Amino acid sequence: MKVSFFETGRYPVNSDTPREWPVPSAAYDPEAGAKAYRAMVERARFVQKLGFDWISLSEHHYSPRILTPSPPLSAAHIASQVDGIKIALLGPIVPASNPIRVAEELAMLDTMQPGRFVFGLLRGTTNEYLSYDLNPKEARERTDEGMELILKAWAEPQPFGWQGRYFQYRTVSIWPRPPQSPRPETYALGVSAEASEFAARHHLGLGVSYGSIDLMAQATGYYRERCAEYGWEPGPDDIIYRCNMILGETDEEADAALERRKSAQAPFPIAANLARALIDQDRRNVGGEARPANVGRVLPISFCGGPERVIKQLRQAREQIGVGVVDISLTDPGSGDTGAMMEKLELFGKKVLPHIREV
């Protein structure tokens, strides 16, 4: 099993930081922002020394919760100063982006350091659509069309036109093209049946996130079924599971931390009236359960315990989900104590990581 660290930027919030979304930019401190980006590089070096395989980034807007509105820029920043560790961009958010620009920027990264970057194509959540004034009901179709266009732009050696429902280009011919063939290491991200179908049809990996092991096993099971129908079999490294983890020196320490979270609110929740307006009506998992956006609550914990219990839980995830890459956050993005998180990362690197390599 490979292990990735989910890097959020970790802007240092304080008691005066507004707890709402969007967070007014008047609260932004330029010195704190610069410090946060320097710390991203320091953490990348730290987790690399601990033996982590990847560091991952994700696109979010209008909040200090995750300070990476442009994953390609963040990836280039880390890659220019830290050697070796792979960098996973999970996503960009496809429906909120210009697909040609995404294809070009990711191709640039792959050309600069071939094989070092991993790309995930993401549909995103409803509040992110509001950032760029998009209709949430169109997100699924915009995502599929945008991903189709990105893949074709990477692969097509001759100029072509594109006249889709959401994107129209008279001529597409990107420079540079990715040096890897048939494409860079790429995943479709999401637990929906549509995400699994797209990934299977295009021979892509699948990235799932934040659901229970049982629910994620349904999603990856459906993905493998669809892959079989398209005549290929995904391996463990074709499945990424992003998740939150509470790791303690003992089970009791971790359980106490979990108990404290039960009444916690998300660090920057969407206002209730906005939340009701932004429920993504077609976001359903492969088991048919409605999954509205996680609004006003902290994200769920997938793994909790001391090192021995967490090792057992990770083995269970490997067996049930078939996951080959686990992408972990040891505290909720944007909350918690950074110093304590670094201590838990070191504990994970010393007491957990060596025991899951063979899983």
Q: What does each of the following model-derived ranges do?
A:
Residues 4-28, 140-175, 215-323, 357-359:
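An alpha-helical appendage that flanks or caps ligand/catalytic pockets
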Residues 3, 47, 51, 59, ...:
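Conserved, mostly hydrophobic/aromatic
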Residues 54-74, 93, 130, 210-211, ...:
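Glycine-rich, proline-tolerant flexible connector loops at the mouths of alpha/beta enzymes
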Residues 21-38, 92-100, 180-191, 245-248, ...:
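Active-site mouth loops of central-metabolism enzymes
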Residues 65-89, 345-359:
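Alpha-helix-loop-beta-strand connector modules within alpha/beta enzyme cores
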Residues 1-81:
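N-terminal beta1-alpha1-beta2 module of alpha/beta enzyme domains
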